């Protein structure tokens, strides 16, 4: 299944998106436990932004904070999906550093609130770079 880092740490301005991705993640973990003994593997890939035409076409509608982290390639996400399908992992977060940060912010919500303005500022700068790159 393909989730999102926003399902691990809520994305301001995208409550519905974050909520559905959190539900998908919980479903994947529960289902993985239910079918494990039958040899079926279930997992979730939780990427941040993916460098595709879709995100670049919608860049003005995407929250700045999304661009505070490196974008993954579609190929890297596909590789992660294959890793899940082979049963090597239950979850892959991409990029891994962002996965660690959202896990930390889950346990320490005040840290998330403290970091948010800094991540928005970084994301704004990166967003401008992406706009120029694709101009």
Residue ranges and their predicted role:
Residues 69-70, 75-135:
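C-terminal tail/cap regions
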Residues 4:
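Residue(s) in the substrate-gating loop at a strand-loop-helix junction
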Residues 34-96:
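SDR active-site lid
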Residues 20:
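Active-site helix of classical SDR
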Residues 7-9:
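Conserved catalytic-site region of short-chain dehydrogenase/reductase
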Residues 23, 30-31, 35:
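Conserved alpha-helical elements of the SDR catalytic core
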């Amino acid at each position: 299944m393909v989730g999102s880092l926003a399902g691990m740490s809520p994305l301001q301005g995208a409550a519905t998106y974050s909520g559905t991705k959190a539900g998908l993640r919980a479903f994947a973990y529960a289902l993985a436990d239910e079918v494990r003994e039958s040899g079926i593997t279930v997992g979730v890939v939780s990427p941040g932004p993916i460098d595709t035409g879709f995100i670049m076409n919608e860049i003005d509608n995407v929250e700045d904070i999304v661009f505070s982290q490196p974008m993954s390639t579609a190929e890297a996400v596909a590789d992660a999906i294959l890793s899940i399908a082979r049963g090597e992992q239950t979850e892959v977060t991409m990029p891994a550093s962002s996965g660690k940060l959202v896990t930390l912010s889950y346990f320490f919500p005040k840290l998330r609130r403290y970091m948010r303005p800094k991540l928005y500022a970084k994301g704004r700068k990166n967003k401008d770079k992406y706009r120029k790159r694709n101009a």
